[in-house]
Amino acid sequence: MARVKPFKGLRPPRELVEQVESRPYDVLDSDEARAEAGNNEKSLYHIIKPEIDFPVGTSEYDARVYERAAENFAKFQREGWLVQDADDHYYVYAQTMNGHTQYGIVVGAAVDDYLNGVILKHELTRRDKEEDRMKHVRVCDANIEPVFLAYPDDDVLDAVVARYTLQEPEYDFIAPVDGFRHQFWIIDKEEDITAVTERFALMPHLYIADGHHRTAAAALVGAEKAKANPAHTGTEEYNYLMAVCFPASQLTILDYNRVVKDINGHSPAEFLALLEKDFVVSPQGTEPYRPARLHEFSLYLKGEWYSLMLKPGLVDETDPIESLDVSISSKRILDEILGIKDLRSDKRIDFVGGLRGLSELKRRVDSGEMQMALALYPVSMQQIIRIADSGNIMPPKATWFEPKLRSGLVVHKLS
């Protein structure tokens, strides 16, 4: 069973939300954060990317940077830019992209559920990235940014959400950069709060969609605090991490594509011939071509697009990892033909998230920076759940969720 609880959110006043809110810390670099914050002292980037308060070139891992995060977090509360709710609430957070809206419930999710395998992951985490986020959680004594979870669709939760979204939202704005709409409501009726808690308690698992390092860091700091507290009861706020939970069917996963600097010494004709061992190769002309189904790939090479359709019978469709298109392309194209063994470390390959589209693949090849591009059919939420349920891990660079959660709509204090 999944254990969730309401919490007293720390939030910007309605009239300040668009000055406070930001993109997540891990989707932009320090220079971009500095530019987006500009002269806005209320921008959450001063808490989640506090290196922007220091001279250009200051490491984001400098001890002074973490200290500044804590100082700025205290300042935001002192100045009234973040104000704590008087009562425990759940919250509804809706995101609208290209006419599609997904409705999440903001909860405190039990740290123990992550440590004990109720909250399931599908990606490996890196210890250095975990430690960075742990330092941030420790100095702020808060989950400044939420993690992004998925849950099996539930009619009762849908009904609760629907009742609130008929009302005027607490926040309603179009975000800069992505241009998507973000709305936020407060679940404040006792019977609805009880219903949310009880419905989640019936779910055997929740699934991390995005934010594996934030989840691990929040859970590990929570466990640290529990161990260090001789009066620990299990009800303290540090036993919970802030998460936005969405019905799995509502989530949008975009293609996560590859661009490669060279084709390993092969001529284009040789490369295409090697592909024909495992794929039916079909020329598609000069207009961008998007894969239309599972096991179909799109190749851009020397100004031409090709469809690569995996030949039948080559993969075990019952194997949740082997049957993934990211696994097929990694093994049968990137490794066996191009000699790229490790996607994380090989400098010959780069990755292009789906929002930037096929035009970005074409641009990077046409510029001469890269020699070829490979577009994949998006992973489905069902595939992610199947892998998480089986205890497996997705290959690197497999999922690109969109839209990303905005940060700064609500913060969860740990004490």
Give the role of each language-model region.
Residues 1-415:
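Surface-exposed, charge/polar-rich loops and edge strands
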